[in-house]
Amino acid sequence: MADETIIFSMNGVGKTLPNSNRVILKDIYLSFFYGAKIGIIGLNGSGKSSLMKIIAGLDKSYRGEVVWSPGYSVGYLEQEPQMDEDKTVLEVIQEGVQQTVDLLKEYEQVNLKFCEPMNDEQMAALIERQGELTEQIDHCNGWELDSKLERAMDALNCPPAQASVKTLSGGERRRVALCRLLLREPDVLLLDEPTNHLDTESIQWLEEHLRQYKGTVIAVTHDRYFLDNVAGWILELDRGEGIPWKGNYSSWLEQKSRRLEMEEKQESKRRKTLERELEWVRMAPKARQAKSKARLGAYEKLSAQDAVQKEASLEIFIPNGPRLGNKVVAFKDVSKSYGDRLLFEHLNFVLPPAGIVGVIGPNGAGKTTLFRLIMGYEQPDGGQIEIGDTVKLAYVDQQHKSIDPDKTVYQTIAADSDFVRLGRREVNARAYVSRFNFSGADQEKLCGVLSGGERNRLHLALTLKDEGNVLLLDEPTNDVDVNTIRALEDGLENFAGCAVVISHDRWFLDRIATHILAFEGDGSVYFFEGSYSEYEQNRKERLGDEPKRFRYKKLME
């Protein structure tokens, strides 16, 4: 809970993107209390990361004033964290508790010196220093450092301690950086998409950790359950303005709905006034020219008002493929392993014809391998995979290899044609692309400069135009804003076929999933009919309420 001590203020802060006239932040006035938990939300490109960099002191190119109260430490988790490539995972994580590490090293060196010959004065000095070090280590509970590091690394599913940083994937680097930052325990935590690349168990641990965190937490995230469970304040960046709300995400949604209704009423009233004034101006006789000028001035004033631009109404169009029969995909006693690691064994499930199956589990558990087995890119070690005769698969993976960075968005979809064929129908190519939130100049962007979220939407548009009736979507919500996720939810709910979706976004899964396929460790995969929340309740009843870190089952003990 915040203690009402203001530690940070923004006074009239604004920012314009370099080499353009686009204003992303304008006249923002904010104050943060110590201990506050704040979630920052907004569309992609609304200035969330820019605001975080200004708060962190990394971006000085802004208008206005930023004031920190003295004596508070700040830690920032960037989307692409920096770390020494020549270090091991453990060495990087230890940087978060470097002072304690140094104390323990010196304490060990002091103890070794007792074996060396020395006079009484040197001995007394050594004993005194040993006492000082003991007191300092006691104060920071340094004797428990090894177990503390182990718990933190396990909770965030970090790579092995001795793994080299240069071999880590982007997701692994993010988890290592988050672990290092949390161990530092700064007064203010700035977290840019902290749940990206975390499995569900790690997200739940992080939520509990941040709820109990004594300092201030400011997080940019599209994870709506995270915002509901952690945030006590929501800061919405909307058309350059910062709009604070005291409450979690659910309460923010309610007031946002009311605010949009009010905006629509005000805009409707303004338009009606404009229409009345314009009608009077057009019909006024010359004899009333003086009064007409006054009315014309009123009209022009209304016209010049900055009408509040509505948020774009996003839509992701998922065309229905050919009619899907009753038999979709069936796994019968399927097993799969890599080397001595068994991913799953005796896996049995049947995909429902009109269902949406959410696939959950830690990174590296075998979720993407499951998709590759369905696609036929890999073969099972045992068992059978049966695909129905009417099935037409459409696979949206995370690699996006089919996207040429030197082509524009429009060229990628249209392929030198003005039309896109959807089954027996032809639709205007630009209209089709616009239904995935690429409109106007965005269609002429080169694919090589697209953001992660834009590449996700483009790959979705590219794959879906083939009109599959069974969709395999691998992490479709990564790097996209909440509005785009909502549009995807609506698109999937209106899709007539079957969809299988790998995701760590619990709110998204609760909205769309009719079934859950959960990788639960030790080669076990559990198929459950119901929503994500219903599965979680079922899991707790079966396995208990305590988190259980995922373990691979070895083929040979």
Segments (PLM) and residue ranges:
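Intracellular alpha-helical coupling/juxtamembrane segments of multi-pass membrane proteins
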Residues: 255-288, 292-298, 302-309
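ABC ATP-binding cassette signature C-motif
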Residues: 1-268, 312, 319-557
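Alpha-helical coupling/stalk and coiled-coil linker elements that connect catalytic or binding modules
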Residues: 277-286, 300, 314-321, 327-330
